[in-house]
Amino acid sequence: MYFSSVIDRPAYCKRHVVKLGRLRDDLARARNTPNLVYITPDLCHDGHDASCADGGPGGLKAVNAWMKRWVPRILRSTAYRRDGVLVITADESDGPQSDATACCGEGASANSPMPGIVGPGGGRIGALVLSRYVKPNTWSTTPYNHYSLLGSIEEIFRLRKLGYARTAGLDTFGLDVYNSGWNE
């Protein structure tokens, strides 16, 4: 977690950034589950590292094991089954085949004068959106980026859009994604 608005405020950070193990208790009862849970795996389980600090395997093997442990818990929870949405995505593409160009006309901004590692963007990645509001086997051809996801979350919670998410013309998730009872 590297947001200066969080880490530069230790008391706030201590109250709001909690260990992942707490999620197990939060999921036990729908009323305990926060309306928004943002999970970032540690550096061992984020799919990047070739090995973990303890010498165990990292990379895709570690992230797959991590997801096998946590995703079923989330999907079985009452809160998720009632009205939840689980989005699984990556922060950037990686590897010799990756294309680091930006999606969706993303340009430079104050927070990211050169988005991406090799150029303007983090490359092409996918997102898996699981919810009762998404029909199985849905495939959207609309190009989205991380700001689209942020803007979609802000719309759901009726929040003012932040940064690049408020850029005119930026697509947010619509009926191509939420295509099963979203507005019913």
Language-model-detected regions and their locations in the chain:
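N-terminal pro-sequences and low-complexity stem/linker regions of secreted or lumenal proteins
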Residues: M1-E184
